[in-house]
C-alpha cells in the first residue's frame, strides 16, 4: 500500500487515529480540470457534488474539531469538469477565538464549519452545530457568516431537514450553557426565518441530529452530557460524556402547532448521531436511525459500533416500542431526500469497506463492496441523485460517494446505478488527490 505521508499536512504526531492513513489532512488547496473517468457518466447528471469534513491546519484534540474543508466535483455533459478543495474560511479561521466567552455567552461566528453542506432557497451553507452557518459558492469560495438577515441568534445544527412538500427548512440549535439549551427554527421556501422558539431540556446534551415527519419534528435528548471539567482542562477533547442517570427520551412537536407543547417519550438509553428517516403512520411515528448502545463513557473515542434501529412512538398510548433492524455496523445513513419525512423504502449506509442498501419495507439488504479483502476500500457517505427523466422512483437514479483506494493512495468519485446497486459502478471519476475521510455532502443540481 502507498504511504499517505507524502500528501498529508505536516502536523506533529500526537498518536490520534485521525492523523494517519486517509484520515490525515491534506496540506493545501487544488483545482484540476477535465478529470479522467472510467466508465461513462450519465448525461442527465448536471450539477455539483460537494462534501464537507475536517482538515486541520494545527493539531486538535478530536476528529470533530478540525477546520472544515470542502471537496467538490462539477459534472456536466457526461464529463467531470473540475475537482477542487477549499477550506471554509470562517471568521475564526485566520485568528482563532473561542466558542464561549468568560461569562458563558457564545461567539456564534467562531466555527470550523466542517460537518455538512446544504443548499436551500439559493443559499449554499457549510454547517457545524456549534455556530452559525457559513455561506459558500458552488465553486467552494467562502462568502461569509449567514444569520438569515439577522434573525438567527443561535447555532444551527449540521442536520437540517427540508420538507419535500412545503420546501421549508427545519432545524434546531443547541449549546447554550444556560437554559434554554435548545431552540427550534423554521425557514420558509423563500429563505425567510419565520419561527424560532426555545425547547426545554434538563441539561446541555450533545444533540447532533433530529427527525422530521410530515406532521411532526422529533428531538433526541440523549445521555451524552456537557462536562465542564473537560471543557476547562485544555485537553482539546469533546467536552461531553455519557451519564447513566440522565436517561434518554424523544421529544415530539406538532408542525401545525410550532409553539405548542413538546411531548416527551422515554426510551432505552442510547446515542444517535444520525437519523435515516422518520414518518407518520396514523397515530404512530416511525423513527429509523443508527443507534449506539453506549458512547463516550471514558473518552471521546469511537470504539463502539452502531446498528440500524427502529422506534415506533404511539401518540395515543404514550409508549415507544423499538427493535434492531440489522446486526451490521454502519453509519451515515441517507435516503432519497424527496421522501424526507415520508415512508422511504431504501436507506444507504456506510459499512465495513462497503455501502449497504437497506430495504426498509422487506428488511432485506444488499452490499456494494470496495477493494479486496487484503486492501479494503474506504467509501464515504453516499448521496442519492434522482434521474430527471422517467418515473420518480427510488431506484431510478444514482448514488455518489468518494471512495479511497489504499493501494494507490487515491480517491475516486464513484457513481452507482440505484437499480443495480451491487453491480459495477457506471462511472469512476479519478481525482487528482486523495479525499480524506469526512462527514456529509450533497448533490446540487444545476
Task: Please report, for each region that a protein language model flagged, where it lies by residue.
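Beta-propeller domains
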Residues: 1-446
